Amino acid sequence: MSGSAKYSDWSQVMTLIANAAEQGNHQPLLTMLMTPDEREALVARVNIFHELLQGELSQRQISQLLGVGVATITRGSNELKSHTDEEKVWLMDLLEKSTKNELDVEKE
C-alpha cells in the first residue's frame, strides 16, 4: 500500500479520460466514475453554459428552463467569466457542433 493517492490532481484525471477516449472507452469510464446525480449535474452545467453563451435568456429564465437554482446559474456564469473570449467562442462552437452531430446521427 502506498502512502499517497495515485491520482492527485485534475491533469492526471484528464489524462486518464483522454487515454480512455483514444480507446473509444470514455463513455464507460465516465459512467463508472460518476453517479447518476453527478452525470445529471454535468448535463445541467453543459446546458447552463450553452444558454449563457447564447445570451438570449436571463439567469432567472435559464434557471426556470433547466429546473436548477439561480445560484447554480451564477456559479456557471462566474466560471465562464474566468475564460477568454477565444475560449468561449471555441466552447460555443463545440456545443453547437456536438448538438448538430447528435441530430445528424439520430436522422440516420
Swiss-Prot record:
One of its GO terms (molecular function) is DNA-binding transcription factor activity. One of its GO terms (cellular component) is cytoplasm. Residues 59-82 bind DNA. It is found in: Cytoplasm. Gene3D superfamilies: TrpR-like. It holds the Pfam family Trp_repressor. The keyword Mitochondrion does not apply. One of its GO terms (biological process) is negative regulation of DNA-templated transcription. InterPro entries: Trp_repress (IPR000831), Trp_repress_bac (IPR013335), Trp_repressor/repl_initiator (IPR010921), TrpR-like_sf (IPR038116). Keywords: Cytoplasm, DNA-binding, Repressor, Transcription, Transcription regulation. HAMAP family: Trp_repressor (MF_00475). This protein is an aporepressor. When complexed with L-tryptophan it binds the operator region of the trp operon and prevents the initiation of transcription. Homodimer. Belongs to the TrpR family. This is Trp operon repressor homolog. It comes from Aliivibrio fischeri (strain MJ11). The lineage of its organism: Bacteria, Pseudomonadati, Pseudomonadota, Gammaproteobacteria, Vibrionales. The gene is trpR.
